[in-house]
Design a protein with these regions (language model features):
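Extracellular/lumenal glycan-associated context and N-glycosylation machinery
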Residues: 26-606
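Hydrophobic alpha-helical segments
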Residues: 1-29, 604-636
Length: 636
């Protein structure tokens, strides 16, 4: 019974949660979630106007690590508001302090907060900065981290130094990438060896240039211990690809040396350079891809469509692709580079194949599946039209200092022609959100302090989230109906505040709707309940008892008999029934005015009363449900 009470309060508060249906977005009508209904009450009171107040009372235990000072929540369907407050005193004082505020509006989601927590003893210095902007005219991001780690942490004993450099540049027709990683471990064991491979393409075909200086072990000595054996091995290993694709390969052994090994594990050292020239493999690749896709039961493509995919893949131009490694005596170096043109067609081919994937018998794709691929194609078209270029960078280093180890990490994101790209998307009916994020953290004495904020804004942000739920579920499914009801309920605002200080944790949350009854009515249909509470109030002002009141408006007549009351589903054999006029007890109501004040909304007009913008982040009102659930969980 207690678990059912927990479930129904949680569900009732979820009525006020903007993403109530997301968790079950893939549920079908037959396998949909089971919607909880009010459990059997401890007592039931009939009011003079025929309402029935269900009362649930339970002794509670103090939560681990603290005592409850205040825990109360309320939901008023008629007023369209939900509010919760939870305050816990911790038995052992925490040195961590922080404040976080979150707000969700129909067109905006935002957050800010600050935190201070004791620094680890091994951290001698620390700073972190992150900034992100995506607006109508620009999109960029920067991240930097610097930290000094005391030698007592033992990091320097494994890594003496390290350097990392990476850049990826993605344009409408060309993609380039370069990167390298080098590090020294301080361990000198191991044979020095290196390998490098570079592929280039021209009108005649592909060329592979390779160099290897590495140990050879007993199981493969016969493949490499003579020049002719090495040439035959290279032809077999690298020329077979051309044969498979109906082309030809020509191998040239530029240099060759096989000598005694420098360690006791290897049987020889190979030092070789060779070139492999491939011709006629593009057509073979295109034909093999087309044949495989057209004959596969996994993909629903005609022969013509499969051939188009194969041609698009073959049209990709590899100007250069290379990788190299060098290790030995504790030093390690790795690098790569790529320069590819006409990749757009191959990317579109990839999405075409994904879109054609067949579903197993008895399953179906969500309604938005094809629409998602159409949006991808439109995005690629917009990138082509605008010439938008994105550049990603990632650099870092590890070095040793007198006091220990210094670590740095930097990441960046930049765009070119972003404004034209957004306009090209807008011309295709795609509206991108604007967003801004900042985060700063550093070492302040013996503490790490941090401050941050994030804001995301888009017209009909919440409505778009709900439409994504309905579009990814079956028409008429429970989740789809609930998501649609949520949109019809006229969501106004959700807010959450969390603070930790002086050994106390406080969480407050709230949400408001213009017509919550719309959502409650659909939930009642889905759950099959005779009736749902019009209000729910929970109170716990100590750590040893809690009470929840659920009011069923107009459930019976004012002169109802006990038999009439016991006919209600939540009134069981053990429920104590008190008819109108038989008791002297009052029941708490939801403090609606306080809830609206907390949300900074004028109760009569439903307009914003806050000064300036409210910070916020995430689906804030979900914490209203969390507060109610946590409150009742102590009954367990």
């Amino acid at each position: 019974v207690r678990s059912r009470l927990l479930a129904v309060v949680f569900a009732a508060l979820l009525i006020a949660t903007p993403m109530a249906g997301v968790a079950g977005a893939q549920e079908s009508q037959e396998d949909g979630p089971e919607w909880p209904t009010p459990p059997e009450a401890d007592s039931a009171y009939v009011t003079d106007d025929g309402d029935v107040v269900l009362v649930y009372e339970q002794e509670t235990e103090s939560p681990t690590g603290g005592t409850v000072e205040t825990a109360n929540f309320g939901l008023d369907v008629g007023e369209g508001v939900a509010h919760a407050l939870f305050v816990q005193n911790m038995t052992s004082a925490s040195e961590t302090t922080g404040e976080f505020t979150t707000v969700l509006d129909p067109d905006r989601i935002a957050a800010n907060g600050s935190l201070a927590t004791p620094s680890p003893d091994a951290l001698s210095s620390f700073s972190l900065n992150a900034d992100l902007v995506q607006s109508d005219t620009e999109a960029n991001a920067d991240f930097s981290l610097e930290a000094g780690i005391d030698e007592s942490a033992g990091v320097g004993g494994f890594v003496e130094s390290a350097d990392l450099e990476n850049e990826l540049r993605v344009g409408p027709d060309r993609l380039t990438a370069d990167g390298q990683l080098s590090f020294s471990t301080g361990f000198g064991a191991g044979t020095e060896q290196s390998q490098s491979f570079t592929v280039t393409e021209d009108d005649s075909g592909y060329t592979l240039d390779a160099a290897q200086n590495r140990p050879v072990y007993s199981y493969s000595v016969d493949n490499w211990n003579t020049r002719s054996a090495a040439e035959q091995t290279i032809t077999q290993n690298y020329g077979s690809l051309a044969t498979q694709l109906g082309g030809e390969a020509s191998v040239t052994l530029e240099s060759y040396s096989f000598s005694n090994a420098t360690d006791s594990y290897a049987d020889g050292m190979l030092d070789v350079e060779f070139t492999v020239e491939y011709t006629g493999i593009d057509d073979g690749l295109s034909e093999q891809v087309a044949t495989m896709l057209a004959s596969s039961e996994q993909y629903d493509l005609t022969q013509s469509e499969a051939e188009t995919v194969g041609e698009q893949i073959a049209e990709m131009q590899i100007n250069e692709a290379s990788v190299s490694t060098s290790t030995g005596d504790g030093a390690n170096e790795y690098s790569y580079s790529a320069d590819v043109e006409n990749y757009d067609g191959a990317l579109r081919a990839y999405y075409t194949v994904l879109q054609s994937a067949s579903m197993p018998a008895g399953t179906s794709l969500p309604a938005s599946y094809n629409a998602s691929f159409e949006r991808i194609q439109q995005t690629l078209d917009a990138q082509q039209e605008s010439g938008m270029v994105q550049t990603f960078t990632l650099d870092g280093s590890v070095s040793q200092a007198d006091s220990g180890t210094d670590v740095t990490l930097n990441a960046g994101y930049e765009t070119e022609n972003w404004e034209a790209y957004r306009q090209a998307l807008a011309d295709r009916g795609i509206d991108l959100a604007t967003s801004e994020m900042t985060l700063q953290a550093g070492l302040d004495g013996d503490e790490i302090t941090a401050d941050g904020s994030v804001t995301v804004q888009q017209d009909e942000l919440v409505s778009n989230m709900l439409r994504s739920v309905t579009s990814t579920t079956e028409n008429g499914s429970d989740v789809s109906r609930l998501a649609q009801a949520f949109e019809d309920a006229g969501f106004q605002r959700a807010r959450t505040d969390i603070s930790v200080s002086d050994g106390q944790v406080q969480m407050e949350a709230g949400a408001s709707f213009r017509n919550m009854q719309q959502l409650a009515s659909v939930y009642q249909e889905l759950s099959g309940a005779e009736s749902l509470p019009s209000t729910i109030v929970g109170e716990q002002n100590s750590s040893d008892s809690s009470t929840v009141y659920m009011r069923l408006s107009g459930a019976v007549s004012a002169d109802a008999t006990e038999e009439d009351v016991r006919a209600l589903e939540p009134v069981g054999e053990d429920t104590e029934v008190s008819l109108a006029g038989e008791y002297d007890r009052t029941f708490p109501s939801v403090d609606v005015e306080n809830a609206y004040d907390y949300l900074n909304i004028d109760r009569s007009t439903g307009t914003d009363t806050s000064e300036g913008s409210q910070p916020g982040f995430g689906v804030a009102v979900a914490l209203v449900a969390l507060a109610g659930a946590a409150f009742l969980a102590r009954r367990e």
